[in-house]
Amino acid sequence: MIVPFGHVLLLAGALFGLGVFCAVARRNLIMIVLGVEIMLNAASIAFIGAAARWQSMEGQAFVLFILAVAATEVSIGLAIIVYAFRRTGSFDPAAYNLMKAGDAMQSFERRGPQ
């Protein structure tokens, strides 16, 4: 039984919407990263459905690229989250001022060059 292309796009759209909700509505950095991963998987489902619909390999090639981007995003994102948690003790994005240049420079000036 072949799944209609409209159903595949409906599933991908629902997953993408769920990922957007998870990334926007939560106040937790891990949930934000999880929401972005759900959105990338929804895009992968849409590309696979389109590749099956039009019998082309480009959709599958895009999925491999998306998987590489997702793996990179998870590894770098979780490393940043672990660093930020060790520094502040919280997963709440509102608690972070780590991206301000002044904060980094003040921290460097207090410690001095190493």
Swiss-Prot record:
Keywords: Cell inner membrane, Cell membrane, Membrane, NAD, Quinone, Translocase, Transmembrane, Transmembrane helix, Transport, Ubiquinone. The chain crosses the membrane at residues 1-21, 29-49, 62-82. It is a multi-pass membrane protein. One of its GO terms (cellular component) is NADH dehydrogenase complex. Its main location: membrane. It is found in: Cell inner membrane. InterPro entries: NADH_UbQ_OxRdtase_chain4L/K, NUOK/Mnh_C1-like. Its EC number is 7.1.1.-. Belongs to the complex I subunit 4L family. NDH-1 shuttles electrons from NADH, via FMN and iron-sulfur (Fe-S) centers, to quinones in the respiratory chain. The immediate electron acceptor for the enzyme in this species is believed to be ubiquinone. Couples the redox reaction to proton translocation (for every two electrons transferred, four hydrogen ions are translocated across the cytoplasmic membrane), and thus conserves the redox energy in a proton gradient. This is NADH-quinone oxidoreductase subunit K 2.
